[in-house]
C-alpha cells in the first residue's frame, strides 16, 4: 500500500501521525493542507490503492517553478523527522464498498510504522447537534482506551469536551446510547477499528456546515495546536500559511467586462 519516494522510509518510533477524515466541508483535509504548507513538510511516499477514487493533479504546495511541475495523487505521505511528525493527506473519496478494506490497510500500515499516536482530524454536521451541543465550544474529541490514560490530564487542563453519545431512540429509550457522527465519513468506523487494535488514536472534530470551510480549518488547527504545539505562536497568534493552490478554491473571480 505505501510506496516510498526513493529508499524505504522509516519513521521515528515516537512519531505522531496526523490524517484527515473525508467529511463535511473537507475541514480535516484543509487543516492538513495548512500543516504541510506551514511546516514545509517534504513528501516521502504515497499510497497505491484501489480503495480511493483515482485522481492526479499539480503540486498543491508549489513554491517555485521547479516543484510546480511535480504531480500529486489521491493519498500522499509527508514527514518531518526533526519534529517526529508524519502527515497523510487524502484527496479523494473512499469507494463505498472498499471502505473496510481501506481502513484495514491503514491500520496495518500504522502498526507497521509503530506510530506513537494517531490524530484524526474530522468534522460533523452542525444541524445534527442536540440541545446540549448547541451551547459552548463547537469542538469535540474522542480517544481510544490505549491513549486515554496518557492524555486525560492534558485534555482536562485544556477543557476539551468529549463527543457525547446520543440516544438510539430519542424520547423512547434514553438508556441505550451510541456514538453518532453524521457527515464524518469513516470517522466512527476508523475510531472503532483503532479501539479494537489497541492503537493510541484521538479524533478531533468540529461541528460545521458546508460552504466556505477555510475558517473552520483554521479554527480546528488552532484547537489541535493547543495540544500538540506544532507551531509556536507569535505575539499570541499562530501564523498558518495557506498553500498557493487555495487561490483556486472557488475558481477565478468575475471578469470585470460583465459589469
Curated annotation (Swiss-Prot):
One short Pfam name that applies is PAC2
Q: How is it modified after translation?
A: Degraded by the proteasome upon completion of 20S proteasome maturation.
- The signal peptide, as residue positions, is none
Q: Does the keyword Nucleus apply?
A: yes
Disulfide bond entries: none
A GO term from the CC aspect: cytosol
Q: Which domain of life is it from?
A: Eukaryota
Alphabetized, the UniProt keywords read:
Chaperone, Nucleus
UniProt cross-references to InterPro entries, sorted A to Z: Proteasome_assmbl_chaperone_2, Proteasome_assmbl_chp_2_euk, PSMG2_sf
Query: Where does the protein principally reside?
Result: nucleus
Cellular compartment(s) = Nucleus
| Gene Ontology biological-process annotations | chaperone-mediated protein complex assembly; proteasome assembly
Carries keyword Nucleus? yes
* Record function comment: Chaperone protein which promotes assembly of the 20S proteasome as part of a heterodimer with psmg1.
Describe the subunit structure: Forms a heterodimer with psmg1.
Q: PANTHER family annotated for this entry?
A: PROTEASOME ASSEMBLY CHAPERONE 2
Family listed = Belongs to the PSMG2 family.
What's this protein's name?
A: Proteasome assembly chaperone 2
Species name for this entry? Answer: Xenopus laevis (African clawed frog)
Amino acid at each position: 500500500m505505501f510506496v516510498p519516494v526513493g529508499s524505504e522510509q522509516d519513521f521515528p518510533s515516537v512519531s505522531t501521525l496526523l490524517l484527515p477524515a473525508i467529511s463535511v466541508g473537507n475541514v480535516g483535509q484543509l487543516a492538513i493542507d495548512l500543516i504541510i504548507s506551514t511546516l514545509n513538510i517534504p513528501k516521502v511516499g504515497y499510497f497505491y490503492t484501489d480503495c480511493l477514487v483515482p485522481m492526479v493533479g499539480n503540486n498543491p504546495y508549489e513554491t517555485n517553478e521547479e516543484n510546480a511541475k511535480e504531480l500529486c495523487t489521491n493519498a500522499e505521505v509527508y514527514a518531518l523527522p526533526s519534529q517526529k511528525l508524519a502527515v497523510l493527506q487524502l484527496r479523494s473519496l473512499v469507494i463505498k464498498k472498499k471502505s473496510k478494506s481501506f481502513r484495514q490497510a491503514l491500520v496495518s500500515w500504522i502498526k507497521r510504522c509503530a506510530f506513537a499516536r494517531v490524530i484524526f482530524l474530522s468534522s460533523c454536521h452542525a444541524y445534527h447537534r442536540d440541545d446540549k451541543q448547541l451551547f459552548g465550544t463547537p469542538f469535540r474529541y474522542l480517544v481510544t482506551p490505549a491513549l486515554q490514560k496518557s492524555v486525560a490530564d492534558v485534555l482536562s487542563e485544556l477543557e476539551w469536551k468529549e463527543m457525547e453519545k446520543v440516544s438510539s431512540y430519542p424520547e423512547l429509550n434514553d438508556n441505550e446510547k451510541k456514538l453518532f457522527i453524521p457527515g464524518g465519513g469513516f470517522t466512527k468506523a476508523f475510531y472503532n477499528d483503532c479501539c479494537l487494535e489497541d492503537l493510541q488514536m484521538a479524533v478531533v472534530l468540529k461541528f460545521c456546515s458546508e460552504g466556505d470551510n477555510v475558517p473552520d480549518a483554521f479554527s480546528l488547527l488552532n484547537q489541535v495546536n493547543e495540544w500538540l504545539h506544532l507551531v509556536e505562536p507569535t505575539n499570541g497568534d499562530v501564523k498558518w500559511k495557506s498553500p498557493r493552490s487555495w487561490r483556486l478554491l472557488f475558481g477565478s473571480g468575475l471578469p470585470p467586462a460583465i459589469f
